[in-house]
């Protein structure tokens, strides 16, 4: 199989990740629940992974990183734990449903919501953020990179608007963590939500969020913590405040190994390889008659994503043909990005998304281009 669905999850993981998970499953106890070797091993692994993520994102320290199951859980924690009825929030049409649906839920309860629109290339106007601020605005919530077009947002520019108005800035880094340099303090990011199974090259079922010192989030969950057992309420200090119950220690072990691999390989090296593959694919397919490509490719400093359609064919049928006839894995449909599809005019047809990993090859790109040429010629 030629795997071009890396924006959904990276299928190929570094060997060190698999080895770390396997070892943890045979030796790891429950962190904070004992003083035996298994429990202490779990605590060390979890701390070391926190520290590695804190360094990766430029956080103040390991205690600012809390683990979750994925970015959806992290975003729900951030959005529902920070906002309340009467608050006003600014977001964009680029967002995934893991941002939109929690915001819609709060809007139904009395929160005010402004969604900044996107143009036909999937871009937003940055001046709109400043103009959308109201006296009761509490936060700005945006993605870093669109999971449909691959377009990037300028986090530092948006963060400066948030900081100037005393707003909290929540970022969904699902598509960019592990590939693009993110410095939460330089970019004025207050909460950064991430998942481990995409660009971070870790296992599924592990993610997390960075929370800036001074930002308090109402926990979604409370319960076992391993510390301060006699408190009636869940301990308030980070990261314990956001980590009720047993953590996914095995997943954290794999994520820690993945972050080490990323740092040793170099984010620049990984990103440049992915973008080179994307550029080669884009330059070839945009010349095929009957192919429509979505997104802004005026700059190749973007996520390694190319979404397209073949003539007026349903995207699901094209993706199925690529899989069945050519062994190429892609993602069709709406990609949990309804507002972006409306902006692009692809609500009915959807789109076929190709997303690349640095483990992909130039030969795989050539095979995919040839397959699309054949499909575009079919009657």
Question: What residue spans do the PLM features occupy?
Answer:
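Pyridoxal 5′-phosphate
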Residues: 1-379
């Amino acid at each position: 199989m030629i795997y071009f669905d890396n924006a959904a999850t990276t299928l190929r993981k570094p060997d060190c990740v698999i080895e770390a998970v396997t070892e943890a499953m045979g030796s790891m106890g429950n962190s904070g629940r004992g003083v035996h070797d298994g429990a202490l091993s779990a605590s060390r692994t979890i701390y070391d992974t926190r520290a590695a993520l804190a360094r990766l994102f430029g956080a103040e320290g390991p205690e600012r990183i809390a683990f979750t199951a994925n970015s959806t859980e992290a975003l729900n924690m951030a959005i529902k734990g920070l906002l309340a009825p009467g608050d006003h929030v600014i977001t964009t049409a680029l967002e995934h449903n893991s941002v939109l649906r929690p915001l819609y839920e709060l809007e139904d309860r009395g929160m005010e919501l402004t969604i900044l629109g996107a143009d036909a290339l999937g871009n937003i106007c940055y001046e709109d953020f400043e103009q959308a601020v109201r006296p009761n605005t509490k936060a700005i919530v945006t993605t870093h990179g669109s999971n449909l077009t691959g377009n990037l947002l300028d986090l530092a520019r948006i963060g400066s608007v948030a900081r100037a108005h005393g707003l909290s800035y929540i970022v969904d880094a699902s598509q960019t963590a592990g590939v693009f340099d993110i410095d939460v303090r330089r970019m004025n990011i207050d909460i950064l939500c991430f998942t481990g199974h995409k660009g971070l090259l870790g296992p599924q079922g592990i993610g997390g969020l960075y929370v800036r010192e001074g930002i308090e989030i109402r926990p979604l969950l409370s319960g076992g913590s391993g510390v301060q057992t006699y408190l009636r309420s869940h301990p308030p200090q980070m990261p314990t405040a956001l980590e009720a119950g047993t953590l996914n220690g095995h997943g954290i072990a794999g994520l820690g190994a993945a972050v080490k691999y990323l740092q040793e390989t170099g984010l620049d090296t990984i990103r440049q390889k992915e973008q080179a593959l994307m550029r080669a694919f884009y330059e070839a397919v945009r010349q095929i008659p009957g192919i429509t490509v979505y997104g802004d490719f005026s700059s190749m400093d973007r996520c390694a994503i190319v979404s397209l359609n073949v003539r007026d064919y349903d995207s699901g049928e094209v993706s199925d043909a690529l899989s069945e006839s050519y062994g190429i894995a892609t993602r069709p449909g709406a990609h949990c990005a309804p507002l972006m599809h409306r902006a692009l005019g692809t609500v009915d047809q959807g789109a076929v998304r190709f997303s690349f990993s640095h483990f992909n090859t130039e030969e795989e790109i050539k095979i995919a281009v040839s397959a699309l040429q054949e499909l575009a010629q079919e009657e």
